[in-house]
C-alpha cells in the first residue's frame, strides 16, 4: 500500500461522496416534479396485490416475454445491475488493500462463482442488446422501429458503462486468483470500476430526462402504481375521468374541475412518472 494509492483512494472516496450527494439531490428534485402532478388516489389501493404483481413482473419479465431474445438479455442485465453491487463495495476496499474481500461471503467459493456467472451473463446480455438495437436501427428504418427519432448517444453511454463494469468484474476476479497477485493491477482496475460507476451517477443526475438510465430506478414504482393490478393492459377501456383526485360529476361539475389535459399541470403524477421512466 503506497502513498500514491492512498491518494487515489482519498480522491475516489471524495468523488463518490460528491457523486452520491448530487444523485440524491436530483432524486429529490425528480420526486418534487412528479409529486406536483394531479392526484390519482386509486394508485394507492390494494398495496399487497400491487407488491406481488411488481415482484412477478420484475423477476419474470412477464410483460416482455413476447420479445424472447431481448427479454432474456434484458433480464440478465437487470439482475447484474443489482447482484454485482457487492463487487463495487469490494472495489472500495481493494483500492486500499488489494486482498480485501467482503466479510463472511467474500471468501465463499459459491459466491465467487455466482458473481462470475452473473458478470458473464450480463456481459453477453448487454452485447446482445447492443446487437439487437443496431440491427433494428439499420434494418428497420421505417416507423416500425421503436428507435426512430431517438437520440442514440445516451443509450451508447449506458451500454458502454454496463460493459465496462462487467469487464472490470471479470478482470478483477482473474487478477485476484493468480498465484502471484499483482496488487497494483488489482487496485488500478478497482479504481477504474469505481470511477466508471460514480461517473454514471453523475451523468444521469445531470439529465433527469435520461429515461434509458433512470428507468432502472423508476420501473419498480411504475409497475407498482400501474392502473390495473391484473393482466389487463393499461391501454384498454377509458378510465373514469377525475379532477383533483376525485371523479367528475358530469351532471353538476365544479367550476374548477379539469376535463382532460390542456396543459402540463393537468397531467397526473403517474403520467409524469411514466414519462420520466420512458426509454
Task: Describe the predicted segments one by one.
Residues 1-269:
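Membrane-embedded alpha-helical bundles of multi-pass integral membrane proteins
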Residues 270-279:
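Cysteine-centered iron-sulfur cluster-binding motifs in ferredoxin-type domains/subunits
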Amino acid at each position: 500500500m503506497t502513498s500514491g494509492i492512498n491518494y487515489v483512494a482519498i480522491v475516489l472516496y471524495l468523488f463518490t461522496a460528491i457523486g452520491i450527494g448530487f444523485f440524491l439531490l436530483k432524486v429529490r428534485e425528480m420526486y418534487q416534479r412528479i409529486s406536483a402532478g394531479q392526484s390519482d388516489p386509486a394508485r394507492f389501493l390494494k398495496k399487497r396485490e400491487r407488491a406481488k404483481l411488481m415482484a412477478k413482473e420484475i423477476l419474470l419479465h412477464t410483460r416482455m416475454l413476447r420479445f424472447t431474445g431481448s427479454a432474456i438479455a434484458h433480464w440478465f442485465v437487470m439482475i447484474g445491475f443489482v447482484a454485482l453491487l457487492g463487487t463495487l463495495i469490494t472495489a472500495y476496499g481493494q483500492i486500499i488493500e488489494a486482498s480485501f474481500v467482503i466479510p463472511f461471503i467474500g471468501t465463499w467459493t459459491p459466491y465467487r462463482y455466482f458473481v462470475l456467472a452473473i458478470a458473464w451473463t450480463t456481459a453477453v446480455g448487454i452485447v446482445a442488446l447492443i446487437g439487437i438495437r443496431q440491427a433494428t436501427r439499420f434494418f428497420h428504418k421505417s416507423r416500425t422501429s421503436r428507435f426512430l427519432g431517438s437520440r442514440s448517444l445516451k443509450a451508447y453511454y449506458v451500454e458502454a458503462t454496463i460493459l465496462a463494469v462487467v469487464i472490470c468484474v471479470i478482470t478483477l476476479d482473474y487478477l485476484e486468483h493468480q498465484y502471484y497477485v499483482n496488487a497494483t493491477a488489482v487496485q488500478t482496475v478497482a479504481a477504474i470500476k469505481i470511477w466508471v460507476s460514480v461517473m454514471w451517477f453523475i451523468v444521469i443526475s445531470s439529465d433527469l430526462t435520461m429515461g434509458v438510465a433512470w428507468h432502472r430506478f423508476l420501473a419498480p414504482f411504475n409497475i407498482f402504481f400501474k392502473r390495473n393490478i391484473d393482466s389487463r393492459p393499461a391501454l384498454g377501456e377509458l378510465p373514469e375521468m377525475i379532477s383533483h383526485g376525485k371523479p367528475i360529476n358530469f351532471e353538476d361539475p365544479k367550476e374548477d374541475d379539469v376535463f382532460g389535459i390542456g396543459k402540463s399541470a393537468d397531467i397526473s403524477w403517474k403520467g409524469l412518472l411514466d414519462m420520466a421512466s420512458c426509454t
